[in-house]
Amino acid sequence: ISDNYLRFYLNYIAPNKEKIEKGRFEGKSLTSMPGWEGIMGLQFKNLVLNNRNKVIELLQVNPNDVIYDNPFFQNKTIRQEGCQIDYMIQTRFDTIYVCEVKFSKQPIKISVVSEMREKIQRLKVPRHISRRPVLIHVNGIVESVLDSEYFSHIIDFSQLL
């Protein structure tokens, strides 16, 4: 489902419809509801994917050079480990942009670097392919993420909203 409101309704409102109608959520903040951050994370990833042309532009990639851009899932087998890439862009010039899309109420912590290193290590691609890590976030990052100089690009999505 690509419509953000419909996705939110099906995942959050519909399962709680009876409680909502009985007034059990009156006076409660949405952000305090169970699973709220997970739902918002999915919504944010969907928002990023719906604005993929802007992401490609910010990465300074010519849209005509893109041969693949979508989320990517690599199944675990005997020879390879599994991994899930939030958003991956492959160009005809043997470059893959491995994008980690992070939503958090707090600034993104330095642990994102080790998480990304592990994903890229697990990703099976030919040796000649360049893998460029990209962080797409909202609500900031801690200074140590910048200091690590790990990511080829860091996109603060709140600047686009």
What spans do the regions from the language model cover?
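A cross-kingdom feature that marks ATP-driven nucleic-acid transaction machinery
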Residues: S2-L161
